[in-house]
Amino acid sequence: MAKKSMIEREKKRLKFVTKFKQKRYDLKKQIKKAEFLEEKLSLYAKLQKLPRNSSAVRLHNRCLISGRPKGYYRDFGLSRHVLREFGHNCLLPGLTKSSW
């Protein structure tokens, strides 16, 4: 189980990303359209003044149940440990254990 503070930190980052997504997108669009170097530099400065956690790159996928950051399956939103446990208990519809 991950520390609660780490899970909360990720939730906070997700809120920041959604809050500043449009502003970030508009600034990047303006930078691409800018013709002069001075104009681009001023737009880059505005982009850098946005909070660090508002960048989507800083997000990390975590398991919804345990908060584990590694061994994450995107399709289910679970880590490999929880996925295996849920699969054995038939809690994931459509998931079958393979045998050959």
UniProtKB/Swiss-Prot annotation:
Belongs to the universal ribosomal protein uS14 family. Keywords: Chloroplast, Plastid, Ribonucleoprotein, Ribosomal protein, RNA-binding, rRNA-binding. The keyword Ribosomal protein applies. Gene3D superfamilies: 1.10.287.1480. Its main location: plastid. GO terms for biological process: translation. One of its GO terms (molecular function) is rRNA binding. This is Small ribosomal subunit protein uS14c. InterPro entries: Ribosomal_uS14, Ribosomal_uS14_bac/plastid, Ribosomal_uS14_CS. It comes from Tupiella akineta (Green alga). One of its GO terms (cellular component) is chloroplast. Part of the 30S ribosomal subunit. Pfam families: Ribosomal_S14 (PF00253). Binds 16S rRNA, required for the assembly of 30S particles. The gene is rps14. It is found in: Plastid, Chloroplast.
